[in-house]
From Swiss-Prot:
One Pfam match: THF_DHG_CYH_C
Binding positions (NADP(+)): 165-167, 190, 231
Membership in a protein family: Belongs to the tetrahydrofolate dehydrogenase/cyclohydrolase family.
GO molecular function, one term: methylenetetrahydrofolate dehydrogenase (NADP+) activity
Record-level GO BP terms: L-histidine biosynthetic process; methionine biosynthetic process; purine nucleotide biosynthetic process; tetrahydrofolate interconversion
Gene: folD
The name this protein goes by in its record: Bifunctional protein FolD
Catalytic activity: (6R)-5,10-methylene-5,6,7,8-tetrahydrofolate + NADP(+) = (6R)-5,10-methenyltetrahydrofolate + NADPH; (6R)-5,10-methenyltetrahydrofolate + H2O = (6R)-10-formyltetrahydrofolate + H(+)
Enzyme Commission code: 1.5.1.5, 3.5.4.9
Protein role: Catalyzes the oxidation of 5,10-methylenetetrahydrofolate to 5,10-methenyltetrahydrofolate and then the hydrolysis of 5,10-methenyltetrahydrofolate to 10-formyltetrahydrofolate.
Cystine connections: none
Amino acid sequence: MSASLIKGSDVAKEIRSDLQKDVEDLKSQGVTPHLAVVLVGEDSASQTYVNMKEKTAGKVGIESTVKRLPTNVEEDELLRLIDELNKDDSVHGILVQLPLPYHIDEYKILNAIDQYKDVDSFHPVNVGNLTIGQKRFTPCTPAGIMKLLDSIDYDLNGKHAVVLGRSNIVGKPISLLLLERNATVSICHSRTKDLTEMTKSADLLIVAVGRPEIVTGKMIKPGAVVIDVGVNKVDDKLIGDVEFESAKEVAGWITPVPGGVGPMTITMLLNNTIEAARRCLNEQ
C-alpha cells in the first residue's frame, strides 16, 4: 500500500482564503489586523521564518511589522520594546521569534508579552487556559495539526494517539488538544522504553523531536495516520523526523516534508492575529 498525502500547503491555502475574507470584514469596520514580530540576532533559519510570516501575512491583508535587534541586545532593551508593543493599540499580535540568544531569559521575555496579544500562545496564562480547555489562542503548530486531521475527517474518539516529543511548543499542547477530542494519548520521549512497541500501537502518530528520520516504516502500525512535524536540513535538503519512503508504504495517511505541517503553522498564527484584532473590535 502507499499512504495518501495530507498536503498542508493545500489545506493552508483554503484556510487563508477564509482569513482574507475575515480581514476584509474587520477592515470594513475600521480595524486592520496588525502583527508585530521581534527578531533578535542573525540566525538564518529564524530570518527565513520571519520573512515567510511577513510575506504570508501580506497575502491575506494583515499588516506586519518586524523589529530587528542585534544578537548582543540587552535583555532590558528587549523588554522595553515588548512593553511599547503591548501599549500600542494598533498592534494586535506580538511574536518573539525563538530561539533567543543565551544571555536572554526566554521565559521572562515570553511572560512580558500581553496575554491578549500573545498569538503564539506561550504566555503562562494562555498555557494554563489551554490545560483547562478555556484557550484564548491555540498554539500555532498544534492548531495546524488539528486542522489537518479535520481535513481528512479523522475521528479521534477512542483512538490511540502517540506523541513523540514533549516540548512546550508541540508535544505537550497537542496532547491536550487530542484529549479534548477523546483520544487516548501516550507521550514518548528520550527516556521511553520500548519505543517501537509504543509507536506500532498508534492509530495516530505525531512525531516532533527534531531528529532526522528517527521513525521508520518498521515502527508504524499499518494504516496509521502519521503527522511529521520535524524539519531538518541534511545535505542541503529538508527532511522530516520520519523516514518518508519507508513510512508511506505502511501508513494510511502521512504528511510530507516540506509542505505538510509547516504551512499550517504560519496560517494558524495569522488566524490568531485576526482573533486578537476581533477581540479589540468587540471591546470598543
